[in-house]
């Protein structure tokens, strides 16, 4: 009995110690190298909401008669192929698509992306036309204290016309935003993933994927394209 009581006491002490450590880690200050200071609680809790998914989808397909929503879950084989193409692994297995249609004809596909900026994820939508090119990019929610300029048209118009086979290199193909380099890299990665997802899930099954931009076709992953290799 005494041994049991001691075991319970020790286990309880360890559990409390773990919870205290976890709570401390959750509340630990975050250092910003560019600001050269710790982020304030207000900055860490910042969340600027600009658009709902439905509002963003309407901006993607302003002339469509109908916009429908479809959640697609990747098979393990599809996920593996897409990760190989973009050059990085991601945890998601399902993606939320909005499909614009006019008189039964598809005007394009748009999907919601959540990728980490500097400290927190940002939520945005990438639209892709039937030719496999970026139509538009719209930021729905931005959670960083700096860098919200990525939602401005003067920045995200740079993605328009990009295909899965175009490099998206910062300061070469995409002009960077001072103080928001990580957000720019994150959005560029999300745009590339969106293009590959649309091609693999929609264009190739329709027999269109292999015919798009064959002259620019490359087997390079995203990181190689990003760095210009």
Pin down the residues of each PLM region.
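Bacterial N-terminal signal peptides that target proteins for export
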Residues: 1-10
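Bacterial N-terminal signal peptides
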Residues: 9-20
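Sec/Tat signal peptide C-region and signal peptidase I cleavage site
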Residues: 21-25
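Flexible, solvent-exposed loop/hinge segments and secondary-structure transition points
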Residues: 26-177, 181-185, 189-229
């Amino acid at each position: 009995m005494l041994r049991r009581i001691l075991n319970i006491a020790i286990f309880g002490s360890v559990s409390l110690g773990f919870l205290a450590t976890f709570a401390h880690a959750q509340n630990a200050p975050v250092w910003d190298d560019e600001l050269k200071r710790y982020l304030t609680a207000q900055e860490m809790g910042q969340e600027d909401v600009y658009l709902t998914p439905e509002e963003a989808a309407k901006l993607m397909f302003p002339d469509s008669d109908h916009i429908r929503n479809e959640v697609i879950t990747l098979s393990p084989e599809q996920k593996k192929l897409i990760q190989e193409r973009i050059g990085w692994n991601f945890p998601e297995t399902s993606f939320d698509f909005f499909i614009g249609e006019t008189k039964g004809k598809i005007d394009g596909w748009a999907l919601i992306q959540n990728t980490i900026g500097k400290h927190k994820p940002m939520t945005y939508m990438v639209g892709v036309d039937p030719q496999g090119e970026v139509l538009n990019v719209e930021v729905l929610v931005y959670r960083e204290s700096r860098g919200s300029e990525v939602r401005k048209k003067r920045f995200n118009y740079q993605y328009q016309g990009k295909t899965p086979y175009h490099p998206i290199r910062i300061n070469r193909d995409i002009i960077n935003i001072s103080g928001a380099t990580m957000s720019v890299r994150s959005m560029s990665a999300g745009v590339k993933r969106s293009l590959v997802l649309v091609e693999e899930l929609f264009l190739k099954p329709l027999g269109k994927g292999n015919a798009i931009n064959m002259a620019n076709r490359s087997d390079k992953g995203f990181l190689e394209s990003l760095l210009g290799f």
